[in-house]
Amino acid sequence: MAHENVWFSHPRRFGKGSRQCRVCSSHTGLVRKYDLNICRQCFREKANDIGFHKYR
């Protein structure tokens, strides 16, 4: 078995490795609330477009 066949061959069904950002495909800092699945950096950029507003 070559390294390419073994690398990432284990199925990722749950845990941090199974989810990624819709925008940038990052695995870190995901906002999963309301089924957004966007990392916090992309959320700050796209929040107004999605419909979130800061009231402060």
Curated annotation (Swiss-Prot):
According to the record, cofactor stoichiometry and binding are noted as:
Binds 1 zinc ion per subunit.
Residues bound to Zn(2+) are C21, C24, C39, C42
What InterPro entries does this protein's entry cite?
Ribosomal_uS14 (IPR001209), Ribosomal_uS14_CS (IPR018271), RIbosomal_uS14_euk_arc (IPR039744), Ribosomal_uS14_sf (IPR043140)
Instruction: State the similarity comment.
Output: Belongs to the universal ribosomal protein uS14 family.
Self-association and partners: Component of the small ribosomal subunit (SSU). Mature yeast ribosomes consist of a small (40S) and a large (60S) subunit. The 40S small subunit contains 1 molecule of ribosomal RNA (18S rRNA) and 33 different proteins (encoded by 57 genes). The large 60S subunit contains 3 rRNA molecules (25S, 5.8S and 5S rRNA) and 46 different proteins (encoded by 81 genes).
The miscellaneous comment for this protein is:
Present with 5410 molecules/cell in log phase SD medium. There are 2 genes for uS14 in yeast.
The name this protein goes by in its record: Small ribosomal subunit protein uS14B
Name of encoding gene? RPS29B
